[in-house]
Amino acid sequence: MDCKYCSNAYIAKCPVEEVPLMHLFPEKVVTIAKKSGCQSIVFAINEPTVSLPSFLKLAATAKKEGILVGCLTNGYLTNTSLQKLCEACDFLNISLKALTDEEYADLTGITSISPICNSITYASSVCHLEITTPVLEPISSEKLGKICRFIAQINPEIPWHVLRLLPEYMLKDAPPPDIQKIEQILHDLRKMLPYTYFGNYVGAQGLSTLCPVCGNIVIERINTGTCGGRLIGYNLSNGKCPHCNTKIPITGNYVDWEHLENGS
């Protein structure tokens, strides 16, 4: 897979001799994580299936120490690799860039979307799954609507991250996506996928989790200037919206990092 717009091309396409590699055994990575107070280890840039055996060893070592494991993946896997990856992970984020063979072939070079759709369907049934869709110009309401319906048919509670992509690599001269147009499209699509998020721009307002019934902010996040977000408010009461008592499908437990960082 060779994404035309890869925002990590400066790493992924960099000649090996120019990269200051650091060789770490799984035990060392886990030791570093524990000393840093980390509760999870995530492959967020590296595609885990490129070095799946190493990833599986790291995941097994981490789980022995009570550390959660997750990854971001393109989802282009064999059934065997998919099953092993899901067994090793507590959570997955799969990138769904389009929903036709033609678009995927144009954007990435692969000729069939079937393995990716299969990965999403299977992963949603065995572990916590979230999906990210990069958006670039020209923005298509039809394309986003099709992806939204596909996800909703599998499980309408799957979190969907719509990423305003700032193209690099072969499309580095492409214009940045229109924020207002994307927001207008997502306004209606949230009726199908209530846990839809939109970010990667300064002042992003679409990063918080809203109660699908009353619209109350139950988990508040702010934009950090990049594609990330910082959690600043956790308003759930026993996993439910404090306003209308609706159960919110959150996986895992809330950790108050601010108090941990202050030593309390």
Regions found by a protein language model. Give the residues of each.
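Alpha-helical scaffolding segments of alpha/beta enzyme cores, especially the outer helices
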Residues: 28-31, 53-64, 80, 84-87, ...
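Short, solvent-exposed loop/turn segments at secondary-structure boundaries
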Residues: 17-19, 105-108, 142, 172-177
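Hydrophobic faces of well-ordered beta-strands that scaffold small-molecule active sites
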Residues: 41, 69-71, 92-94, 129-131, ...
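Conserved Radical SAM active-site core
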Residues: 1-91, 259-264
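Short, well-ordered coil/turn segments that N-cap beta-strands
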Residues: 37-39, 65-67, 88-90, 125-129, ...
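Conserved radical SAM core fold
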Residues: 12-13, 48-50, 76-82, 92-110, ...
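Conserved glycine-rich "GG(E/T)P / GGGxP" loop and the immediately following alpha-helix
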Residues: 33-61, 100-118, 127, 133-152
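Auxiliary Fe-S-binding modules of radical SAM enzymes
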Residues: 144-264
